[in-house]
A protein has these predicted regions:
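Basic helix-turn-helix/winged-helix DNA-binding cores
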Residues: 2-109
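Intrinsically disordered, low-complexity, charge-dense segments enriched in Lys/Arg
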Residues: 107, 111-188
C-alpha cells in the first residue's frame, strides 16, 4: 500500500479537530465514591476518546497494582486518587517506563497533594495539546523558577502529546488512503 508523502488540508483539519475542546476532568470532578474495575477503565478511557493508542485495559490496571505503581483498591473499588493516577499513567505510559512513572509519583507526593499535582497536570496537558496539534499558536511558558517536578512533568507531557499527534496523523493518512485506494498514487 502506498501513502502520500504529505497531509492535505482536510487531513490536517481532522487531526487538529482531535484537540478542539479537549479537557480533562479536574480532581474535584472525579467521582468521590469508589468505582469498580470496569467503571474505572471506562471513565479513564472516556478522557482520551478519539486519541488512538491512549487507552487502559483491566489487565493494565491489575499490573499497575501488582507492581505497586498505584495502591490496591479498597473492597475492589478505586478511589479518586487512583483515578487521577491512572489518567496520568495512560497519558505517559507510551513515553516513560513504569519505573520512571513511579519515580515521578514519589517526587510529587513529597511536594504536594494528589489533587494539586493532578490539577496541575491537567492544566499542563490543556496548555500543550492545542499547541502541538496546531490548534493554538502559543504555549504558556514554564515559570523560570519551576521546580524539577514541574520541568519533568512538562517534558513528559510534551513527549506524550507529540506521540498522540503523530498517531492521529498516521490514522488520518491511512483513512485517506482507504477512501481513495490507487487514485492518490495515480495523481502523483
Amino acid at each position: 500500500m502506498r501513502y502520500t508523502t504529505s497531509m492535505d488540508q482536510e487531513m490536517k483539519r481532522r487531526v487538529t479537530a482531535c484537540a478542539a475542546g479537549f479537557s480533562l476532568p479536574r480532581y474535584r470532578e472525579l467521582p468521590a465514591v469508589g468505582l469498580y474495575l470496569d467503571q474505572t477503565v471506562q471513565l479513564v478511557n472516556s478522557c482520551f476518546r478519539g486519541f488512538p493508542g491512549v487507552e487502559l485495559t483491566p489487565s493494565m490496571v491489575s499490573n499497575y497494582v501488582k507492581k505497586g505503581v498505584i495502591s490496591h483498591p479498597v473492597k475492589k473499588k478505586y478511589s479518586r486518587e487512583q483515578l487521577a493516577s491512572l489518567i496520568y499513567i495512560v497519558l505517559s505510559k507510551n513515553v516513560l517506563s513504569l519505573e520512571n512513572i513511579d519515580t515521578l509519583f514519589q517526587m510529587q507526593r513529597a511536594h504536594c497533594t494528589a489533587a494539586e499535582a493532578y490539577d496541575y497536570f491537567c492544566d499542563e496537558v490543556e496548555n500543550c495539546l492545542p499547541f502541538i496539534f496546531e490548534a493554538s499558536s502559543s504555549i504558556r511558558d514554564l515559570d523560570p523558577d519551576a521546580n524539577d517536578e514541574k520541568r519533568l512533568l512538562r517534558g513528559t507531557i510534551v513527549a506524550a502529546v507529540n506521540k498522540m499527534y503523530l498517531d492521529c496523523c498516521f490514522v488520518a493518512m491511512r483513512q485517506e488512503q482507504a477512501l481513495w485506494p490507487g487514485i492518490l498514487g495515480d495523481l502523483e
